[in-house]
Amino acid sequence: MVAAGTTVVSANTVTAAAQAPVNLRSAGTFAILSQSGVTDVYASAIKGDVGASPITGAAIGLACSEVTGTIFAVDAAGPPCAVTAPTILTTAVGDVGAAYLDAEGRTFPNFVDLDAGEIGGLTLAPGLYKWNTDVNISTDVTLSGGPTDVWIFQIAGTLDQAAAKNVTLAGGAQAKNVFWQSAGAVTLGTTAHFEGTILSKTMIAMKTGASTNGRLLAQTAVTLQMNTVTLPAL
């Protein structure tokens, strides 16, 4: 058990090697990719591509003015600026599935069930973290490492971030190297800030005013409420 609030968690280099980033392939250009649609309370600001497949483009509830990037739809029922590109979307959705399995399948974790899933208040070093439980971020959490270091979080349950709490990066850590694989739903609380790519087996919900420097890659729905989602520097 690691006490929350003051602890710096260091990776166990004896039992696990440094992790390679999860390969997102064609999904890497998407700030948001969903299989069953995107709902939105206006106005959100999305910097990066947006797509939904196999569901109709009518399920993409974003205005063109909210997206700096390309909106891809499987048919002409999407927003008026959307590009109809079912083949691109089929490939990207398949790549999300492969990335999810890659993250889920990494072995020899540095930490298992750290703090029973309550990581608020911790500073986490690079490495592979595995939980057989839900994970909660009830207070700010920091990921501290260098620009090439990688964090992969394997979560068997849900991931919940409390309102007005932050995931922050320190020491040169980069959002492009942070991956959260969650078998359950992911909820980012009101005005919370999050870092990294979320690979969710189900849905991702951002509450009012929450922001993400990363990607929302959901195998069901994505719900937005006046949010900011920024694709990380590649």
Predicted regions and their residues:
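Secretory targeting and sorting signals
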Residues: 1-13
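Solvent-exposed adhesion/ligand-recognition segments of exported proteins
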Residues: 12-234
